[in-house]
């Protein structure tokens, strides 16, 4: 039976942290967003392990290699399910402990791919509904800074990255509506002013002759 490799998205701690760096407009490091983004990636990899724990009765062996953790299954159905959902990926039967024998489900290269960029965006904008695997902080109810507001806006919508686009769409719609209302108000004021003049003329006419 084929061995499979756990589809971790981690490479090395320095490299992974570098891929999650976030900066302010002036070029200085946004430490909180950087660490939160890195934490989200770690949580994603923990979720992979949780899936494997749920199927541990169908895993017969775990083999450790310098760059990979290999698994052997007693059920092809379970193995194929985990392959299809991206938890694990297939390797060759003659695996010799190098990455050359890996058969990734996506094209992995040294250059950053569009999928890599998408994953980084998702890591920045998503967090677990429960507040993370490690629970919410006791400081969550304290007054938050401007950076915290930015972080909350980026991370507060689990599995709904389109909400950011919707916010800007609604903002543009409000600007247009306000502009229309302002124009209507000006027209109404002009009409009211005209009515006032007519009323004034009528009053003057009462005293003519």
UniProtKB/Swiss-Prot annotation:
<feature type="region of interest" description="Disordered">
    <location>
        <begin position="177"/>
        <end position="209"/>
    </location>
</feature>
<protein>
    <recommendedName>
        <fullName>Uncharacterized protein R514</fullName>
    </recommendedName>
</protein>
<feature type="compositionally biased region" description="Acidic residues">
    <location>
        <begin position="183"/>
        <end position="202"/>
    </location>
</feature>
């Amino acid at each position: 039976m084929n061995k499979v490799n756990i589809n971790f998205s981690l490479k090395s701690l320095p490299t992974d942290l570098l891929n999650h760096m976030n900066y302010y407009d002036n070029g200085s490091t946004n430490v909180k967003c950087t660490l939160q983004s890195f934490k989200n990636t770690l949580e994603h990899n923990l979720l992979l392990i949780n899936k494997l724990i749920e199927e541990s009765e169908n895993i017969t062996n775990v083999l450790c290699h310098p760059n990979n953790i290999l698994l052997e299954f007693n059920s092809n159905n379970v193995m194929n399910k985990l392959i299809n959902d991206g938890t694990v990926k297939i390797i060759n039967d003659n695996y010799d402990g190098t990455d050359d024998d890996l058969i990734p489900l996506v094209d992995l290269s040294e250059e950053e791919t569009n999928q890599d960029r998408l994953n980084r965006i998702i890591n920045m904008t998503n967090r677990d509904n429960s507040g993370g695997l490690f629970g919410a902080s006791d400081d969550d109810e304290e007054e938050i800074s401007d950076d915290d507001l930015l972080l909350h806006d980026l991370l507060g919508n689990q599995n709904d990255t389109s909400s950011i686009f919707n916010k800007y769409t609604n903002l543009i719609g409000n600007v247009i509506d306000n502009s229309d209302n302002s124009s209507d108000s000006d027209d109404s004021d002009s009409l009211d002013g005209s009515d006032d003049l007519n009323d004034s003329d009528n009053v003057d006419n009462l005293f003519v002759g």
